[in-house]
Every structure is written in structure tokens, then in C-alpha cells.
Amino acid sequence: MSEPNSDAKAADAKARVRAAFETVTKAVSLQTHADGGKDPVAVTAVAANARLSMTAGSAYLLSRLDPATPPELAAAVRSLAELLEDIAMNSLAGVANEDAVQAARLRDAEAASVRVAEILK
């Protein structure tokens, strides 16, 4: 049986992760679905914001973990954060979303996001 204090700390840690996850999910969705139109500068800016949202989102999620975060949740968040970093860095390196390995990363990130959401229910 857990002590009430540790249960409260775990609940607080989970709430911090939930808030961060909701913010990151919104930011990544918003920035990766923006339309730069036909202007090459705008298209480049939209792509940069998409990559930034993933890189910053990864760091933001990881910064919200603490020792009281339930282990299953912490592992799922770390997995998602790593995938977001990998996607962003490979995009910056010129790897297209249609590349087989990058496409797999994108699918894995979606699955990891679903997993985090399930744990947070």
C-alpha cells in the first residue's frame, strides 16, 4: 500500500505531464498542419515551425517528468519525446516524410502519443 503523500505526489506529477502533453499535442498539431501556400519563404517558415514544435515539445515533455511520475507514464513520455526529436532532426537533415524510415518514425510517434493519452486517462 502506498503512503498518501506518495500517492499525492504521483497524482501531481501525472497532472503536470497531462498539462504538458496537451500543450505539446496542440502545438505539434497546429504547426504541422499549417499551410504556407505557394510562397517558398512561407513554406519554409511553416516547415521550420513544425520542426521547432517537435523539438521544443520533446524538451518540454521531458522537463515535466520528475521522480514521482508513475514509471509507465515516464517511459511512454520518454519514448514519445525521443521519436519527436528523431523526426525533427531527420527533417532538418532533409529527410522527407515519404522516406520509409521517416514514415515509420511518424507512425511510431502517433502510436506513442496514443499510448501516453491512454495512460493519462
Describe each PLM feature range.
Residues 1-16:
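N-terminal low-complexity, Pro/Thr-rich disordered segments
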Residues 60-96:
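Long, amphipathic, charge-rich alpha-helical segments that form helical bundles/coiled-coils
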Residues 4-5, 97-100:
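Short helix/strand-bridging catalytic loops that position acidic/His residues to coordinate divalent metals
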Residues 10-12, 24-67, 101, 105-120:
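Alpha-helical segments in soluble extracytoplasmic regions
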